[in-house]
Amino acid sequence: MKVIIAATLLGILMHAFAEECELMPPGDNFDLEKYFSIPHVYVTHSRNGPKEQVCREYKTTKNSDGTTTTLVTSDYKTGGKPYHSELKCTNTPKSGVKGQFSVECEVPNGNGGKKKIHVETSVIATDYKNYALLQSCTKTESGIADDVLLLQTKKEGVDPGVTSVLKSVNWSLDDWFSRSKVNCDNMK
């Protein structure tokens, strides 16, 4: 009987830990000041989707308390009908891990109010000027939503630094959702 109880508890614990975000390690020698000096970027590629991810822009400002605020805007059309959303997110550096953040976002709930969601992020790589690879992990009611986003200061093309980083981890942008392949003005 003790073995059955122990096995059951172990199974419950394993399931609980399996439902947590597992962030990839951030890039070496991450510099917070340099990273947040990139004020405006476009999501040009998304590893897991959904395709609407690549119709987003991030605008970041520094706050006096050491946090940063990112305004995430999303604009696209589906069947001619326009969609616009704005998320206001506060990025707080995780204690002891440079390049990882706990992020609180305010999401409009459709009733004129706002709902808060919690996102964990890790800056996998950046050149502090033109691009960043950002892992984003959100725990939802239906499970874990994990993605890697390519953020770039230009909407089109791929910075050469990105290509070498992706090769080092055996990833290819050919398999990712791309802003150039998704028509944000008429998504189907």
UniProtKB/Swiss-Prot annotation:
Q: Does the keyword Secreted apply?
A: yes
Keyword list (alphabetical) reads: Disulfide bond, Hemostasis impairing toxin, Platelet aggregation inhibiting toxin, Secreted, Signal, Toxin
User: What name appears for this protein in its UniProt entry?
Assistant: Pallidipin
Q: Which GO terms describe its molecular function?
A: toxin activity
Provenance organism? Meccus pallidipennis (Triatomine bug)
User: What is the documented function of this protein?
Assistant: Has been described as a specific inhibitor of collagen-induced platelet aggregation. However, as it does not affect platelet shape change or adhesion, it is plausible that it exerts its antiplatelet activity by a mechanism similar to that of triplatin, moubatin and dipetalodipin as scavenging eicosanoids involved in inflammation such as thromboxane A2 (TXA2).
Q: What's one Pfam family the UniProt record gives for this protein?
A: Triabin
Q: Which family does it belong to?
A: Belongs to the calycin superfamily. Triabin family.
> In its UniProt record, which GO terms are filed under biological process?
symbiont-mediated perturbation of host defenses
Localization: Secreted
- InterPro entries annotated for this entry? Calycin, Triabi/Procalin
**CDD domains linked:** lipocalin_LTBP1-like
Q: Name one GO cellular component term.
A: extracellular region
